Amino acid sequence: MRLSNDNEKFDTCLAASDWRYSAAIVGLCKYFKYYKHELGYELSDDYLKFNAADITEDRYLKFAESYFEDQFQHRELEKYMNLESWSEDQTKRINELLRGNSVMKKVFGKIRFDGNNSEEIRELIQINRSELIRETFRNKSNLYKNFANPGQLFKERGICCRLWGYYVDGGRKTKALSYNFDVNTFVSQDDPLFDFIPFAFWGDREVFFVNDNFSLEQLIRTNETLEKQVQMQVTEEQKSK
């Protein structure tokens, strides 16, 4: 649940009223820790307090690029472009990346890497970085799209929740989703802060989040422990291959 906190140091206050707000709080805490030298916040047993103006699209995208770095093809491409020479296999991989998904095709068009145009590719990445992050993040099936309607990323509060299982397309018939076939009984509160839910889940093929919300500090600790356990398991699985 989101509360206004007027005339206080922080103007926004979140409580873990259900799993959605619990997960959003975990994601937001990671966001604020990433910007710990720029932004302030307070976490108590009951509330996460912060200033709403500190949540911006530019900051969100920069955080997402860092947090899910290995999921962004432009980051892999960027690392290749920082090399001084390239093997045949590396050149092949670079050209695969240039057409890796819809937004990569849009940004790089018909460009093919020939060993002499690394600076051109670097410049295109830098100029189009926000679009590359946003479109990849919202449309990739194991990122935002795994949790919410990709068309709702960065949208203001809607008439129904952006999360799958709660989202109702207003242009389609929705009676089957409502108790006793009455659409007016379908309750689905939305909040732009639900965009932080993907950062609360951990896993590889399956993702997990523990709603241990006896207190917010306990919630954070439990999910930090889960994160470490999943990382260890993934590392062990990679070693055994």
Where are the regions a protein language model picked out?
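Conserved small-residue
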Residues: M1-L143
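Domain-exit/linker segments immediately C-terminal to small folded modules
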Residues: D169-K241
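Generic preference for hydrophobic/aromatic residues in regular secondary structure cores
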Residues: L3, T12-A15, V26-K30, L48-A53, ...
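Extended, Lys/Arg-enriched charged tracts that mediate electrostatic binding to polyanionic substrates
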Residues: S141-D169, S178-F194
